[in-house]
Amino acid sequence: MDLSESLHDFILVFLGSGLILGSLGVVFFTNTIFSAFSLGLVLVCVSLFYILSNSHFVAASQLLIYVGAINVLIIFAVMFMNGSEYDQNFRVWTVGDGITLMVCTSIFISQINTILDTSWHGIIWTTRPNQILEQDLISTSQQIGIHLSTDFFLPFELISIILLVALIGAIFVARQ
């Protein structure tokens, strides 16, 4: 996207905030439905990051595969589960939880140190869409990606909608 630098930075901070809040919601919500919806927010924010960096095909794939299929399946699975199983076996803290907390905290601190120690001034964040020419592409998978995101985008989207409707219909029929 050809945006001014200040608008690009504002959108980047907004998406980062949505990503952080959504991931905190995934971890801290006690209701699994709310946690699954927070996961959907995280996946949509990641897809919008791809759009911001001019990777439209990857963004469309992210939306279709992860948000449109995986997250919907997670929500359906949570809806079909019996919630009383979890209430009976609830424990506050175990030794494994403490070890996991220490490992995750150390990984988080090391990632923060890596981010702060990295020089970000020489990195080119985006490419212009007109810089990619079809004859310059190395592999056929890149050519397929270009054609799916330009010439065949509408059929690709229609097939994904048909598959989603078929999945919802199969779950509805199986439930009855």
UniProtKB/Swiss-Prot annotation:
Keywords: Chloroplast, Membrane, NAD, NADP, Plastid, Plastoquinone, Quinone, Thylakoid, Translocase, Transmembrane, Transmembrane helix, Transport. It is a multi-pass membrane protein. Its main location: plastid. It catalyses: a plastoquinone + NADH + (n+1) H(+)(in) = a plastoquinol + NAD(+) + n H(+)(out); a plastoquinone + NADPH + (n+1) H(+)(in) = a plastoquinol + NADP(+) + n H(+)(out). It comes from the Eukaryota. It is found in: Plastid, Chloroplast thylakoid membrane. One of its GO terms (cellular component) is chloroplast thylakoid membrane. Belongs to the complex I subunit 6 family. NDH is composed of at least 16 different subunits, 5 of which are encoded in the nucleus. NDH shuttles electrons from NAD(P)H:plastoquinone, via FMN and iron-sulfur (Fe-S) centers, to quinones in the photosynthetic chain and possibly in a chloroplast respiratory chain. The immediate electron acceptor for the enzyme in this species is believed to be plastoquinone. Couples the redox reaction to proton translocation, and thus conserves the redox energy in a proton gradient. This is NAD(P)H-quinone oxidoreductase subunit 6, chloroplastic. It comes from Phaseolus vulgaris (Kidney bean). The gene is ndhG.
